[in-house]
Amino acid sequence: MNVLVTGCSRGVGLEICRVLLEQGNTVYGVARSYTDEFKALEAEYAGKLFFKSIDLSDSESIRKSVFKEFVGNKVVLDVYVNNAAMAYDDIVTNLNLDRLKAMYAVNVFTPMMITKYALRNMLLHHTKGCIIHISSISAHTGYKGLAMYASSKGALEAFSKNTAREWGGLGIRSNVVVPGFMETAMSSTLSEEQKERIYKRTSLKAATSVRSVAETVVFLLSDSACSITGQNIHVDNGTV
C-alpha cells in the first residue's frame, strides 16, 4: 500500500512509518524537520520511504506542496495518517488568538485539506482507502492547561466521524486513534512529578507505549479492520 504520513520525523509518526515499512508498505512522509532519526530509517528502507519538508501551518498551499509536488495523481494513495500536531499549553484566561489560530491551522485546517485531496485521489483511482487521525486523551479527560489543544483534537474526531459517514458507501473508512500520555518530544517539558500524576490516572500506572499506538494505526488500515469505521480507538493504558 501507499501511505501518506504527516508528522513523520520523530516520536509516534516515526514509529508509525517504521511499522508500516516492516510490513512492506511504501511511505510518503511529510514534516517540517528532516531529522537524523528519519534519515536513518530512510537509509534502511531505501526506495520505500520518501520525505518532503512542508510547513503544515500553511493550509492553503497543501494541494501544491503535497499533492502536486510530492504525492501526485499517478500515485494510488491507499491511506492517509494524520499525525502532525502543534501543542498549546496554557489556561483559558490566558488564551491568545494568534496562538490559537496557529495551532488550529496545523491540528485542524491542514488535516481537513489533506483529507479533501486524499479523498479525491482515492475517488480518482476507485480506491477503498483509509484515513486515520491521531487525537489525544485530553479531548476526553480534563487536564489543566490543555483546553485549547483538546478542543482541536475534539474537532478532528468530529470531522473523522462525519467523513466516515459521508464516504463509507464507497468503501472509504475513517477512524481516530486516541493515545494516552506518551514519552515523546511534545511531553518532554513536563516534570517527573507532573508525569507521575498523569500515570496515576491510568489503570496500568505507566506511559502509553508509542509502539502500541503505531501498531494500532497499522491494524486499522489492514483488512482485519475492514468493518471498523467512524470510531475513536483508545490506546491509553486505561485512562478513560
Where are these regions (language model features)?
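Catalytic Tyr-X3-Lys loop
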Residues: 86, 93-113, 132, 156
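Residue(s) in the substrate-gating loop at a strand-loop-helix junction
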Residues: 136
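Alpha-helical segment proximal to the catalytic Tyr-Lys
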Residues: 120, 124, 165-169, 226
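C-terminal substrate-recognition "lid" of short-chain dehydrogenase/reductases
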Residues: 206-235
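Active-site-adjacent segment of SDR/Rossmann-fold oxidoreductases
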Residues: 141, 162-172
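Conserved mid-core segment of classical short-chain dehydrogenase/reductases
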Residues: 87-101, 120, 145-148, 186-191
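Active-site helix of classical SDR
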Residues: 115, 152, 160
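Conserved glycine-rich cofactor-binding loop
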Residues: 9-10
